[in-house]
Amino acid sequence: MSSTSASPISNITVDDELNLSREQDFAEEDFIVIKEERETSLSPMLTPPHTPTEEPLRRVHPAISEEAVATQLHMRHMAHYQQQQQQQQQQQQHRLWLQMQQQQQQHQAPQQYPVYPTASADPVAVHQQLMNHWIRNAAIYQQQQQQQQHPHHHHHHGHPHHPHPHPHHVRPYPAGLHSLHAAVMGRHFGAMPTLKLGGAGGASGVPSGATGSSRPKKQFICKYCNRQFTKSYNLLIHERTHTDERPYSCDICGKAFRRQDHLRDHRYIHSKDKPFKCSDCGKGFCQSRTLAVHKVTHLEEGPHKCPICQRSFNQRANLKSHLQSHSEQSTKEVVVTTSPATSHSVPNQALSSPQPENLAQHLPVLDLSSSSSSSEKPKRMLGFTIDEIMSR
């Protein structure tokens, strides 16, 4: 039953008022939502209510969400860092274990090769140790090669109390130790003399003039005088002096030469003018040095004099040949001519064989170092003389 009020203004009961108040509340909320939607929407038509998102929550509790995200990231970083630390520790423990295993193997394995010498070691003892080790390994290696070549001989005639060494136990001389051995011996035994195993005659097969690094030079021997040359062209030119072969001839004057460069020098005389002329005879020359040599021939007294007969020569080569004739004549006179007093006093002495002291007394003293004074001797000019040019 519903209770009614006695007010004459309206006939509204209490239940009706409660229902009206509820309807008004709902209507106000709906009005607010509709009003907000109308403000934000572009069309005048009604739209469904706005779906709530995370933005209102962040607006209400902004500090709590940032702290939660920061703590989660920090925990992840800490877990990753701890995992890396554990992996590094495990790797370090594995390395230490491997090093310990290698050290144990090195201590257990026997030493295969001799210890290389140091600066403080005795050089003589080190050298002896290396040589003994090399000789022993060489003998074992040679014995093994013989066994491989003749296996049946060792099978029938081998003694049981001399077992053959196993091939795995043979340690031949390492190839890399040769260079090390040479370097060490050069440092410790630099002053020691080398031993020649081939004897004085060089029986080892290596030429005496050839070194370990230098290549021996080729030798070309002349078949006429056995003179040696290092180049075949020089031997060919030399042999033409024996055969007097002159394959290069001048087209103008017909003069022949042994060498092509001599012909080229000769053609230079024909092809060019002769600006240098002699003032005495009027002869022209291509070069000034040739004219200077020619002027010596016009001197009344040559610059080179013989110390025995005072004969003068224009060229030093002519003086040398003249002095040789004096020496031959003096030796013949001393051998043939003897004094009569010497022959009667010493009858048993041979007349044709004088003593060396007497021979030295009779021979004239020849001074070839200074044939004339420095003032009279002209300065030696570079190049060829006229006689040398004409003798080609």
Swiss-Prot record:
Keywords: Activator, Developmental protein, DNA-binding, Metal-binding, Nucleus, Pair-rule protein, Repeat, Repressor, Transcription, Transcription regulation, Zinc, Zinc-finger. GO terms for cellular component: nucleus. It comes from the Eukaryota. The keyword Transferase does not apply. It is found in: Nucleus. One of its GO terms (biological process) is negative regulation of transcription by RNA polymerase II. It holds the Pfam family zf-C2H2. Belongs to the Odd C2H2-type zinc-finger protein family. Pair-rule protein that determines both the size and polarity of even-numbered as well as odd-numbered parasegments during embryogenesis. DNA-binding transcription factor that acts primarily as a transcriptional repressor but can also function as a transcriptional activator, depending on the stage of development and spatial restrictions. May function redundantly with odd and drm in leg joint formation during the larval stages, acting downstream of Notch activation. This is Protein odd-skipped. It comes from Drosophila melanogaster. The gene is odd.
